Amino acid sequence: MTATPDAPAATSDAPFDLVVRGEQTLTTAGIVAREIGIRDGRIVAIEPLGSGLTGAEVIELADDQVMIPGLVDTHVHVNEPGRTEWEGFDSATRAAAAGGVTTLIDMPLNSIPPTGDVDALNAKRQAATGKLHIDVGFWGGAIPGNTADLRGLHDDGVFGFKCFLLHSGVDEFPHLDADEMEKDMAVLAGFDSMMIVHAEDSRAIDRAPSAEGNKYERFLKSRPRGAENVAIAEVIERARWTGVRAHILHLSSSDALPMLATAKRDGVRITVETCPHYLTLLAEEIPNGATAFKCCPPIREASNRELLWQGLLDGTIDCVVSDHSPSTAELKQLDVGDFQTAWGGVSSIQVAFTAVW
């Protein structure tokens, strides 16, 4: 039995508030048959199915239903305050709960103001008050001119700091160049915080072909793997020099996996995420004009997808997160289908887990 230290032990004369029984329960032992006892809102017992736990309420799961621990999604754009027409905390956390996510960490941009100082963090917390259906935490932003604000945000509870190495897509969250990123990394290393990086190189993107028009192949060429690879190499070396904890966001280019694996072996404190859309969708199958699929970095080819799966299985990629980034339908320009001007983002928190299950 697994029990919290202050929880009463399970006994036959002390039924649980809720017992859930299922043939498929995801545990550290794999998918096994278990029954779960819950008291005062906390799981206090995990026993083999048939152990006879009793409860005021009992839920028997169907054979094809799976009981899982609550998921943690560390890459979510909620957009409140400031852009609630895109989405807000009420809708985002309801969708998360429907998708099995019980904790999300909100990104520092797309809200107005972005989370670049303590006042902005407090504004976001105030906006979230009374609207949350799951647990929520916050990332801070690392942007030009806010180095002096990083320690205050850390002390006030942010989990780390996000920066971009190219235009973020919104003017109020400007990007850092590699030297500015390194300067902030050195500051963060002083209190063991983390720099999380949207790693696409601005110069490489500027030199790539335009994405204008409705051809997905053209959009793919506008965000080449090389732009990711160059930026990731910068993050690795700057993390190596400063000793900071660094994290690569939404890895799309499988070309970067060997250098990331080498950096990990070398002791660089770097972790990597990818997303369900990179693991399940294929560039070859995205119709021209289907801007619902536009995200940056982009969904790539079948050969790339298979290598991402290998990177996940061998531990080079540490986690899978949604990068949930909603907008209005008008911004996705579904009727126009222009990949240059459509908003780049996939709204997926409700379906992310089932997509890769």
Explain the meaning of each model-derived region.
Residues 148-163, 167-320:
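Histidine/acidic residue-rich metal-binding segments in metalloenzymes
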Residues 65-127, 131:
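Metal-associated gating/positioning segment near the N- to mid-region
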Residues 118-134, 181-197, 351-355:
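Alpha-helix-loop-beta-strand connector modules within alpha/beta enzyme cores
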Residues 81, 107-133, 138-146, 165-171, ...:
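Active-site loop-to-helix "anion-binding N-cap" substructures in soluble metabolic enzymes
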Residues 109, 292-294, 337-342:
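Short beta-alpha connecting loops at secondary-structure transitions
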Residues 23, 41, 64, 75, ...:
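Divalent metal-coordination and catalytic microenvironments
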Residues 2-69:
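Histidine-rich, glycine-flanked metal-binding segment
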Residues 101-103, 134, 159, 318:
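Short acidic/polar active-site loop segments enriched in Thr and Asp
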